[in-house]
Amino acid sequence: MDRAPDSIGPTVDVALLADAVQAVRGKLFVLGGGWDTLWVRAFPARHPSMAIGLRLRVPSSWGADMLKLSVELQDADGAPLLSQPLSHQVRLPGQSQPAATDFGVIRSFTFNNLLFARQGSYSFVISVDDEPVSRLRFTVRARPGEPPSPT
């Protein structure tokens, strides 16, 4: 890739957790978004569906025509919880962008039937070309008044 030596890479403008997200024509359509705590009855807990809405800002000086955007779920110790990260190959606009401008990349990631073994902190690590650029943290907790899970 022909990147300028002083170029700043892509940055995350928006990253949020939601019940559902669609990315259509440069817009995020979000249902039940912006939460940071997932309440469950007991552990282990299987959550039917959650999503991430993401807007990445890419400077025109980035110099690449493609980038790999990935999201990996990790527990509090940094151990991955998915067999592999979810990834999108993103084609970037050609030379039609004026110099010194940025452009946005809008994407959504949906995760179905995630299993959370225990209460605690989790995070989605967002990476560009296998380099982490952001971390979206959340907690999974038992609802108050629910009996504790056997350990």
Positions of the model-derived regions?
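Contiguous segments within soluble domain cores/interaction surfaces
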Residues: D2-Q119, S123-V128, P132-T151
